[in-house]
């Protein structure tokens, strides 16, 4: 699943690759050898599997967990926050 909900807000499967999301949506999510998927990016930051409806801020991204089990993240709402000037 990868769909635009509104400007700068998306619904993404956590299994999508960071490289794919960056190419398709120009998101500029940092890439790393530590992870390849959006779920991996989130867990790399949180160090654990987040719970449903948990809100996570990573840099200028706001991520709300829509669906997760105790083993993996399934679906997230991904928003880009405008940088404050």
What spans do the regions from the language model cover?
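Cytosolic regulatory modules rich in charged/polar residues
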Residues: 1-85
């Amino acid at each position: 699943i990868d769909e635009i909900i509104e400007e700068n807000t998306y619904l993404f499967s956590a299994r999508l690759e960071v490289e794919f999301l960056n190419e398709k949506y120009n998101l500029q999510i940092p890439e790393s050898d530590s992870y390849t998927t959006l779920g991996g990016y989130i867990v790399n930051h949180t160090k654990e599997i987040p719970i449903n409806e948990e809100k996570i801020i990573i840099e200028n991204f706001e991520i709300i967990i829509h669906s997760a089990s105790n083993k993996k993240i399934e679906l997230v709402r991904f928003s880009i926050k405008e940088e404050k000037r």
